[in-house]
Every structure is written in structure tokens, then in C-alpha cells.
């Protein structure tokens, strides 16, 4: 069932998302360790049946940040009057099903280098998050190096046409399923498999009780993904039924 929601705030022109990204220099490789609360889940016990390519919606992420921006990635993504970011990469990870996946796999593959992390800051604004995604997820996949993993991510991001989500709102109202339909219209590869697109929401950070768009998951067959074969496959979890596209962008503190 299609659900209509109210868009209460004024829209920012789509041109604001088209500004050129200028990333600051990354001076040192981020040091990422496995959190104690996250166990190692070896590939042998958690085989990959589908890959999820996940993009986060910048306005919702930035609106949820509190206080001055300290993290370099947050400053790049959220610390400008009109950030050139809409949907940015969260990661590309393998899943066994909707509740299981491999993570923190042991690997001899080298991690991404400093220049490789720098290269991809305009699609994933945080070098630390890039390194985290490689160590937690990419190392469980078929890539021979962290650099190769991020090459695949960048190739897929460039291949996908990102619809202007702001245009989904009309006369102050929007249809939640329009996010899926907009991706299908922009990317014919999903025409026969809309279930390969999953919309994820988050509680509104403003206390309004609404739900905001958090992420869009695009799901693919595992076979050949490291070689640039991107074949849509149904996502292991259904989309959220309702969402609210927040049009405000966080201003510098």
C-alpha cells in the first residue's frame, strides 16, 4: 500500500547537490580495530548469498549530528552551507540472509593505501569509514586488496544513476515507494527486479515522531561482482513502509 507523508520543510534546489567536492588531504592511514562487541564471523560459516550496495542519505545523517563537527569526514560531508552530497556510499557487503553475514574475516589481502582512500573521499567522505568497511566487510569478499574493493565500489557508484530525491516531493506530499520507482526509472537493470531495492528509515532526529530516509540498499548477485558484474538480486529484507525525506542540510557550527 502506498503511504503519503507530509513534507513540512522547504526544498533545497537540486543544483546544490551538484557542487564540486573538494576533499581535504588525509595525512595518515586510519587505524581500525574490531570492536569487542562485534565477533568474527568467518566466511566458512556465513556464506555470501547476496551483496548489498548501501548508500546513505546525507541530509538525514547530518541532521542527526550534535554539537560542533570534529570528525574530518563529518566536516567534509556536513560542514558546508550547501554540501555537494546527497546519497553517499556506506559500503558494499555480503550477506547470508537478512540477519546473518560474514564480518571481520582474516585476510592476507593488503588494506587500501592512503592515496586510494583519498581518491574516494567524494563518494565516501570519511577515510576512517572506508578503512572500516574494508576490514569488516570487504576482506570477507573475493577482492585481492582493499584498493581493488574500493575500485569495485567506485565503479558501481559511477554506474548507478542517482535520482533527485528532492523532486519526489510535490505539493508538500510524497509517496514512500517513489524512492524505489525513481531508482527503477533511472536504472533499467532493476526494471524486472524491484525487490533488489530496499529503503531503510531512521527515527527523526528532531523529535517529531516522523521517520526519515536513512539508506538505500541495492542488492546484487555475488558471482563476478569483483570483476564488475552487477546483476540485481532480491534483497534479503523488505523496505520500510513509510519515510520522510528531510530537505534541510546541517550548517557549520
Where do the PLM segments sit?
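Domain-level detector of nuclease and nuclease-like folds
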Residues: 69-253
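Positively charged n-region of N-terminal signal peptides that target proteins for export
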Residues: 1-2
